[in-house]
């Protein structure tokens, strides 16, 4: 069984940005691992220290994913061997074919922990030949520097994604975890990508956006990439169609 590993700084990062895509991959036979580097406790009442761990466990359970936990301090991640080592261990131990992580934004627009994790994952992943697809997600609050070049329609998994996000009750006050905000993001990427075939029970189009950091042709891909007509480059022997660095749709 092929494995997909999602590596993120905090509990709720993956839920917000790629749980629909992870659900799609699981439905097509992938083992899905969600790795959280920090304890996520910054700004949280110490008396509720166990809440974030439990919330992450519940969220992954909603989707049937396996949860991996790191123990580095929330809010103080630095690009260093201390961060690289646990990520390298996960990749060595689980040998993922697909890795998903934060977008690396050198301008520092995103959360500093996200930037550090993204840089560390890129460092490790580009040294591991077994990783055939490396995707970076949209920053939680959006960023003008984020230019996705692939989109995934995740309507079939939208309800479970929202249920997983709702597990993070300690973070319920944050605007970017509100259903309306999540829907607005999805609507925007649906418009940008030209997606027009709703798959969700609510009749809406639900889209997640990614930037491809690494892509190799491989026959076992669970994602079929459909590009705009003027940018198509297909491999007839593979489900994965390699995209050029320009927006297109994943069906």
Language-model features: locations:
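Active-site environment of divalent metal-dependent phosphoester hydrolases
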Residues: 14, 40-44, 75, 104-110, ...
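The feature marks non-catalytic terminal segments
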Residues: 2, 131-133, 137-251
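Active-site adenylate/phosphate-handling loop in enzymes that bind or generate adenylated species
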Residues: 90-133
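Internal, well-ordered alpha-helical segments in soluble enzyme and binding-protein domains
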Residues: 52, 83, 113-121, 157, ...
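Active-site rim/loop-helix segments in enzyme catalytic domains that contact anionic ligands
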Residues: 1-97, 126-127, 217-250
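Short, well-ordered secondary-structure micro-motifs
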Residues: 45-47, 79-81, 110-112, 146-149
